[in-house]
């Protein structure tokens, strides 16, 4: 049995493991991780579909939310529309965060090839931060994306395990006569490409994937949307609450599916946190060893600016100058 090298137990080894990867590298690698997790979830959804109890034999479980809310079939379509709206709003917010970053580092506002009155100013102007301004603006867009995508990947990976472990009877009308999956590979690919909208899957009840992405958008705008405009918080909160109602009212998920997803998403987003180094170092361990998809050293980081530092050599007694790169924080 091989004995681990002594240096693994030394402080220097763990210091190297804690050294943050470049933010750009984290963006690329964690996005790749998210795609891999999406395929894992797609396979888990297929297994869950095959293991789902027969609706003709097993009836839906008692649910207080079902008893309090009148059933409105098809309301889940409105939840999908709300998710689409929040997707667009989050992309817009991320772009505005990028403009705040450019403003912080002294870059000018980008310009369109042709100036369109009103439109250019709305999209390309810097909306100066008025709330949550304790967050450093440098690289805020990159850090926000890393926080969002790592939280999403963790939640989907855990959901892949949970939906396979226990099979619940489907409460929605669409899964009372579940269709047969004829081409499993095609169904997996469609699940990833359409985020589940164009594939066949029933029985993936604990916990709600729709609620995960809704709550992620809610948390994203609660923290970062307020930096762009004060109205983003109340607007996204109302949209998210209405979407939760649509999910339960359409019987798309049990009420517990929604409540558990809300709790897990909020807890995960808070645990990942906002840090100038990107994701927590424990999560960076999973991508640190990759031989591709970005550099492993932060010696030259994005948006770094050279600073001249003079120091005196004690050995030679002469002054020398070196150019070092300011850390990208």
Swiss-Prot record:
GO cellular component, one term: plasma membrane
Source taxonomy: Eukaryota, Discoba, Euglenozoa, Kinetoplastea, Metakinetoplastina
Active-site residues annotated for this sequence: 210, 253, 257
GO MF annotation: an example: sphingomyelin synthase activity
Membrane spanning residue stretches: 27-47, 75-95, 148-168, 212-232, 234-254, 258-278
Catalyzed reaction equations: an N-acylsphing-4-enine + a 1,2-diacyl-sn-glycero-3-phosphocholine = a sphingomyelin + a 1,2-diacyl-sn-glycerol
Function of the protein: Bidirectional lipid cholinephosphotransferase capable of converting phosphatidylcholine (PC) and ceramide to sphingomyelin (SM) and diacylglycerol (DAG) and vice versa. Direction is dependent on the relative concentrations of DAG and ceramide as phosphocholine acceptors. Directly and specifically recognizes the choline head group on the substrate. Also requires two fatty chains on the choline-P donor molecule in order to be recognized efficiently as a substrate. Does not function strictly as a SM synthase.
PANTHER family named among the record's database cross-references: SPHINGOMYELIN SYNTHASE-RELATED PROTEIN 1, SPHINGOMYELIN SYNTHETASE
InterPro entries: Sphingomyelin_synth-like, Sphingomyelin_synth-like_dom
Ranges facing Cytoplasmic side: 1-26, 96-147, 233, 279-329
Extracellular topological intervals: 48-74, 169-211, 255-257
Protein name in the entry: Phosphatidylcholine:ceramide cholinephosphotransferase 3
Compartments where found: Membrane
Top-level taxonomic group: Eukaryota
Gene Ontology biological process: ceramide biosynthetic process; sphingomyelin biosynthetic process
Main localization of the protein described in the UniProt heading: membrane
EC number: 2.7.8.27
Disulfide bridge positions per record: none
Gene transcribed to yield this protein: SLS3
Keywords: Kinase, Lipid metabolism, Membrane, Sphingolipid metabolism, Transferase, Transmembrane, Transmembrane helix
Family: Belongs to the sphingomyelin synthase family.
UniProt topology in membrane: Multi-pass membrane protein
């Amino acid at each position: 049995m091989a004995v681990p090298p002594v240096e693994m137990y030394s402080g220097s080894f763990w210091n190297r493991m804690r050294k943050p990867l470049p933010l750009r590298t984290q963006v690329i690698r964690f996005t790749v991780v998210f795609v891999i997790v999406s395929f894992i979830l797609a396979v888990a959804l297929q297994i869950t579909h095959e293991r789902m109890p027969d609706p003709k034999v097993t009836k839906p479980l008692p649910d207080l939310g079902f008893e309090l809310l009148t059933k409105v079939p098809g309301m889940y379509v409105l939840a999908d529309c709300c998710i689409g709206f929040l997707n667009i709003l989050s992309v817009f917010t991320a772009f505005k965060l990028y403009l705040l970053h450019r403003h912080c580092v002294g870059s000018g506002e980008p310009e369109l090839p042709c100036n369109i009155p009103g439109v250019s100013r709305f999209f390309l102007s810097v909306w100066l931060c008025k709330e949550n301004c304790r967050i450093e603006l440098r690289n805020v867009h990159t850090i926000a994306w890393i926080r969002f995508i790592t939280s999403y990947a963790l939640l989907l990976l855990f959901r892949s395990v949970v939906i396979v472990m226990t099979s619940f009877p489907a409460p929605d009308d669409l899964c009372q006569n579940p269709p047969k999956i004829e081409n499993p590979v095609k169904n997996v690919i469609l699940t990833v490409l359409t985020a589940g909208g164009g594939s066949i899957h029933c029985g993936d009840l604990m916990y709600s994937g729709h609620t995960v992405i809704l709550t992620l958008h809610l948390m994203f705008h609660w923290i970062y949307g307020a930096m762009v405009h004060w109205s983003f918080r109340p607007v996204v909160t109302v949209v998210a609450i209405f979407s939760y109602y649509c999910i339960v009212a359409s019987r798309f998920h049990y009420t517990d599916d929604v409540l558990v997803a809300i709790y897990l998403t909020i807890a995960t987003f808070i645990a990942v946190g906002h840090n100038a180094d990107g994701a927590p170092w424990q999560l960076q361990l999973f991508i640190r060893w990759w031989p591709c998809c970005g550099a492993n050293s932060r010696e030259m980081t994005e948006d770094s600016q050279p600073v001249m530092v003079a120091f005196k050599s004690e050995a030679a007694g002469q002054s020398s100058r070196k150019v070092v790169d300011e850390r990208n924080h």
